Regions:
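Pyridoxal 5′-phosphate
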Residues: 1-404
Length: 404
């Protein structure tokens, strides 16, 4: 049974007030709150096992190393990767995409080669490729979307050429909530011999992800959006691909031997993990993933889908309401505008009512241009949100709308 009262008690911040009002936190697409078990696990490691990993023969270092590598195993199991060697720790999704963009372009792309992305991408899956285009002369091709906010896959098929080297696509839109058909995208790309990178920042916290079932070649996500700490993320890569890619950064730990003439590199996954990792954060991430597993990803998905349907129904009763994104497969995100009210004004006034939402372009300016707007208000739901909080949002929007 999904006991929302018990779940909410795991998150102390949810009981606080803002401007004298109960906090209604609906900005989970930006970051999630952290359960006590995560905070306790990280504090316990700092108090009892704080030492650099993989470098010391002393007890604390070995204990910290064991926790760090156990976290890698937890991540591997959570996304059903085949091997711990396929799990690379990063600072987050953005660094993960930059890692693949840099290493893949260096190893496998020539001037004039092409990468395919989509019209709904977050800037973190646009700008890294633009940087590579400026440095290496690669070209970027874009899969368009229809008016429902869904990818036009037939148009994607037309983008493949003999120069296509990679497809890089988000699994879930952080603006529209669209859940993209990753398995079908991967199938079509593989027919052309093209690997696929998936941005899973907005999927991992919300529903079960199985990278072997998706058959994607690379997958990346962030800890802080999955109820874990900031500053830690994951790149999954098929081992055969990671073996072939050159390192992203150089430094300690990612080497086998170093001389002034030559450096040889460590085996996977350490080849991509230069320097001291945030070993306490990896332990926190593993604790968060264990928390999600204990609740059950299917249970979380059902709860959030119910919230999304209910919120959509209630918001649509407000005069002047415009919701952006009407995919038949939609995740826990609703972006909207009301009449001529600027999204910043609406979000600011909702904040005075204790309701935390996101306003602006959500790091997706090309998508906003496609929609013909400058930004939206975004309500994004998490495993601890309730229908009562949706009611508070709807009442708040009505109250603000009445002021204009």
């Amino acid at each position: 049974m999904y006991n929302i009262t018990s779940i909410r008690s795991d998150f102390p911040i949810l009981s606080r007030e803002v401007y004298g009002k109960p906090l209604v936190y609906l900005d989970n697409g930006a970051t999630t709150q952290k359960p006590l078990c995560v905070l306790d696990a990280m504090q316990h490691e700092y108090l009892n096992a704080n030492a650099n990993v993989h470098r010391g023969v002393h007890y604390l270092s070995q204990q910290a190393t064991d926790l760090h590598e156990a976290a890698r195993t937890t991540v591997r199991k959570f996304i059903n990767a085949r091997s711990d060697n396929e799990i690379i720790f990063t600072r987050g999704t953005t660094e993960g995409i930059n890692l693949i963009a840099s290493s893949f372009c260096e190893g496998f792309m020539q001037p004039g080669d092409e990468v395919i992305i989509t019209a709904m991408e977050h800037h973190s899956n646009i700008v890294p490729w633009q940087l590579q285009a400026a440095r290496s002369g690669i070209a970027i091709r874009v899969i368009p979307i229809d008016d429902r906010g869904e990818l036009i896959l037939d148009e994607m098929d037309k983008l493949f050429t003999s120069r296509t080297r990679l497809v890089s696509v988000m699994q879930v839109s952080n603006v529209l909530g669209t859940v993209n058909p990753i398995k079908e995208i991967v199938r079509r790309a593989h027919l052309h011999g093209v690997p696929v990178l998936v941005d899973g920042a907005q999927s991992v916290p919300h529903f079960k992800v199985d990278v072997q079932d998706l058959d994607c070649d690379f997958f990346t996500f962030s800890g802080h959006k999955a109820y874990g700490p900031t500053g830690v993320g994951v790149v999954y890569g098929k081992e055969e691909w990671l073996e072939k890619l050159p390192p992203y950064q150089g430094g300690g730990e990612m080497i086998a031997t170093v001389s002034f003439e030559k450096t040889t590199f460590a085996e996977l996954p350490f080849k991509f993990e230069a320097g001291t990792p945030d070993y306490v954060a990896t332990h926190g991430l593993a604790t968060a993933l264990d928390y999600l597993s204990a609740l059950g990803m299917d249970n979380i998905q059902r709860h959030e889908q119910d919230l999304t349907r209910y919120a959509t129904q209630q918001l649509e009763t407000i005069d002047g309401m415009r919701i952006f994104g009407h995919s038949t497969d939609k995740d826990a995100v609703i972006s909207f505008l009301v009449g001529d009210i600027h999204h910043l004004d609406l979000g600011t006034l909702l904040d005075r009512l204790g309701i935390a939402v996101r306003t602006g372009h959500h790091c997706a300016q090309p998508l906003m241009a496609r929609l013909g707007i400058s930004g939206t208000v975004r309500a994004s739901f998490g495993l601890y949100n309730t229908r009562e909080e949706i009611d508070a949002l709807v009442a708040g929007v009505r109250r603000v709308a009445a002021m204009f």
